[in-house]
Structure formats: structure tokens, C-alpha cells
């Protein structure tokens, strides 16, 4: 048997992350029936990585234990790893919903102001397929990495994505600078996905958002 866990914060403050991630992992880890499970798939986030100032991160990059929300997610990963064989999948920003936040923002005319922070993404269908791929590898007796960065092959500043979407949707953007937001600036390297034989349906956000717009 396998267990797939996709935790979410109960709220967006530190306590909400502690309850939604750390406490959830500790509760699961304490269950005696977990020993009958072959592998746990724990879906975390690339938020666990330390600020890279535009540099690259991969499965072995330093983790962020200074920010409370990220620290709660790191603690959750560690708790479930101690209890059972686990593959932690760390997705970048998951998209693909035709009514998703970025599309709605662009449709309202917001966005497009230049910025320097890189954005990392993975289409929701690719994330689901990756989870299935890991389970199939394990069933076949093949090696499954303990950690996987789930991101597509095109890290791009968010404002460029907004401008591309605006052109496709026929919308004029305000390009008014937004209030300063604390935004991580990193590029996620997901080369390990190819090494385990996984192929992205949407290798970049262009294919993914084009499909979402048509949906």
C-alpha cells in the first residue's frame, strides 16, 4: 500500500503552517498501521529552500529554517521521513486552472510591471502524472529518489508571463508597480525528473497556459 499526502496550511500565519504541516506529519508518523505502507509520497513545496538571490536550487540545496512557515514544512518532511520510506515532492507554483489566480489578475488588467524575481511553475497535470510515475517505479522495484523538485524547464520572471498572457487574452495591463512584496528569487532545477524517466507534458508555462486558456 501507498500513502499520498498533500498537506495545506490551516491559515497563512506560522501557527497555520505548523498545524497543517508539522502536526499533520507527526500525527501520521505516530500511526502503527504506517509500518504496512511501502512508501509515503509527501507533497511539500519549493518554499522550503533558502533564498538564492536568483541562483539555482535543486534537491540538495540548503533549506530555509529561519522563516517560520518554511521551517514548519521542513520539520514536516523530516518527521515523515523518520517514520517510513518517503519520497518528498517539492512542487514549484502549481497552475493549470482556467480560473487560476494569475489569469484572473491579468484579465483584471493588473500586472506586467518589470521585476527581477524569477518564477517557477509546474502544470497541475504534470504534477499528478509525476506522483503516478513515482508509484509505478516503486511497484516495479525501481529506485525512487527520496526528494524531487517538481518544476518545468522554463524559469521566467512573473511579469513576462503576465505580459504574454495579456497578449493572448487581448488585455491591456496597467504595468503599475505593485507594493513591495517579499518574493523568493530562485531558479528551480528539475533535471532529476528526466533521470527517472519522466517527461513533462508541458515543458514550459507557454504550453501550459495556452492549454488553460483553451479549456
Model-derived features: positions:
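Mid/C-terminal beta-alpha module of Rossmann-like enzyme folds, strongest
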Residues: 128-133, 137-184
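Non-catalytic, hydrophobic alpha-helical segments
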Residues: 89, 127, 131, 150, ...
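NAD(P)-cofactor binding segment of oxidoreductase domains
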Residues: 1-41, 75
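C-terminal amphipathic/interface module of NAD(P)-dependent oxidoreductases
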Residues: 136, 180-215
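Substrate-positioning beta->alpha
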Residues: 94, 101-104, 113-135
Amino acid at each position: 500500500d501507498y500513502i499520498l499526502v498533500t498537506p495545506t496550511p490551516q491559515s497563512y500565519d506560522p501557527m497555520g503552517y505548523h498545524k497543517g504541516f508539522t502536526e499533520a506529519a507527526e500525527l501520521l508518523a505516530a500511526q502503527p498501521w504506517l509500518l504496512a505502507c511501502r512508501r509515503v509520497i509527501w507533497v511539500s513545496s519549493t518554499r522550503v529552500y533558502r533564498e538564492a538571490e536568483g541562483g539555482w536550487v535543486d534537491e540538495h540545496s540548503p533549506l530555509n529554517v529561519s522563516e517560520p512557515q518554511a521551517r514548519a514544512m521542513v520539520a514536516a518532511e523530516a518527521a515523515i521521513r523518520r517514520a517510513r520510506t518517503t519520497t518528498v515532492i517539492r512542487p514549484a507554483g502549481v497552475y493549470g486552472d482556467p480560473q487560476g489566480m494569475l489569469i484572473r489578475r491579468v484579465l483584471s488588467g493588473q500586472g506586467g510591471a518589470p521585476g527581477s524575481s524569477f518564477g517557477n511553475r509546474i502544470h497541475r497535470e504534470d504534477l499528478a502524472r509525476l506522483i503516478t510515475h513515482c508509484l509505478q517505479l516503486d511497484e516495479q522495484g525501481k529506485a525512487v529518489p527520496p526528494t524531487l523538485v517538481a518544476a518545468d524547464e522554463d524559469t521566467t520572471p512573473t511579469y513576462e508571463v503576465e505580459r504574454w498572457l495579456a497578449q493572448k487574452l487581448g488585455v491591456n495591463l496597467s504595468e503599475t508597480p505593485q507594493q513591495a512584496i517579499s518574493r523568493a528569487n530562485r531558479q528551480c532545477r528539475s533535471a532529476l525528473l528526466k533521470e527517472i524517466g519522466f517527461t513533462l507534458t508541458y515543458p514550459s508555462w507557454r504550453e501550459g497556459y495556452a492549454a488553460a486558456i483553451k479549456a
